[in-house]
Amino acid sequence: MAKKVANVVKLQIPAGAATPAPPVGPALGQAGINIMGFTKEFNARTADQKGMLIPVVITVYEDRSFDFITKTPPAAVLLKKAAGVEHGSGEPNTNKVATVTKDQVKEIAETKMQDLNAADVEAAMRMIEGTARSMGFVVEG
């Protein structure tokens, strides 16, 4: 028989840098998860993606065991890395802060494809371009 799910916790944690300190520790402690067990496993699984913000969905079962799924980094994080900026524009319609090429957008769309609700890469590219425009980026090409 399948285990009963007690809780689902969604967090965004820097890859390879999960620690028992806030905000990770309290969120996991409330759910009844072994914090050290989770942080060690998460850091081992994301060690190759250092510096990225990784969304994680943790499923906690009634016997206090857990599973977790790591997702691809948010599109905004990938766009900022591709453009080489730290922040998007506060006024995206008037202040353009960076430029990204169609090739960069395609690369990001291919990376994000498994997490996006898109039929093909072109649809995923349109989603990523929309995110870029809403951040004050210009899409060239």
Swiss-Prot record:
Keywords: Methylation, Ribonucleoprotein, Ribosomal protein, RNA-binding, rRNA-binding. NCBIfam families: L11_bact (TIGR01632). Forms part of the ribosomal stalk which helps the ribosome interact with GTP-bound translation factors. Gene3D superfamilies: Ribosomal protein L11, C-terminal domain, Ribosomal protein L11/L12, N-terminal domain. InterPro entries: Ribosomal_uL11, Ribosomal_uL11_bac-typ, Ribosomal_uL11_C, Ribosomal_uL11_C_sf, Ribosomal_uL11_CS, Ribosomal_uL11_N, Ribosomal_uL11_N_sf. It holds the Pfam family Ribosomal_L11. GO terms for molecular function: large ribosomal subunit rRNA binding; structural constituent of ribosome. One or more lysine residues are methylated. Transmembrane segments: none annotated. This is Large ribosomal subunit protein uL11. The gene is rplK. One of its GO terms (biological process) is translation. Disulfide bonds: none annotated. Part of the ribosomal stalk of the 50S ribosomal subunit. Interacts with L10 and the large rRNA to form the base of the stalk. L10 forms an elongated spine to which L12 dimers bind in a sequential fashion forming a multimeric L10(L12)X complex. It comes from Limosilactobacillus fermentum (strain NBRC 3956 / LMG 18251). Belongs to the universal ribosomal protein uL11 family.
